[in-house]
Amino acid sequence: DYPKKAQKKPRKIEKKTVLVIRDGSSAAIRKRPAKGLLAGLYELPNLSGWLSQDEVLDWLKQEGLSPIRIRRLLDAKHIFSHIEWHMTGYVVLVEELENYSGKDMLFIEPKRTEEEYPIPAAFSAYTAYLQIRLGQEKYDEK
């Protein structure tokens, strides 16, 4: 008798709402925690669960942002070895970000993400709305 291969455990599914927050020239990103999946990398702001447009608007206002326009984006999925992210997204135009005083988001020119703030490919469905290349893509071209 040959040893039997253990069956793979099903991946854990995490629902997320990804936000592409812009003020015209700047976009919001934030740093991921130092431990865990994609540790220490930058990401687009995202929230647990699939939020409605009204829930997203409420969250933005709680963060001290003033949304002008919001548009729903297509759903996306990213598969890691042990986790699947099932994502929905919104692109949000807000008033000037210069006066934002929140603690965990950075507002940068999207081109700066290419060199200084690489964003993981897990967010590729939404980074197109920033018109930037992802962290890995800049190395693939060389």
Where are these predicted regions, by residue range?
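Intrinsically disordered, low-complexity, charged terminal extensions of DNA damage-control enzymes
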Residues: 1-142
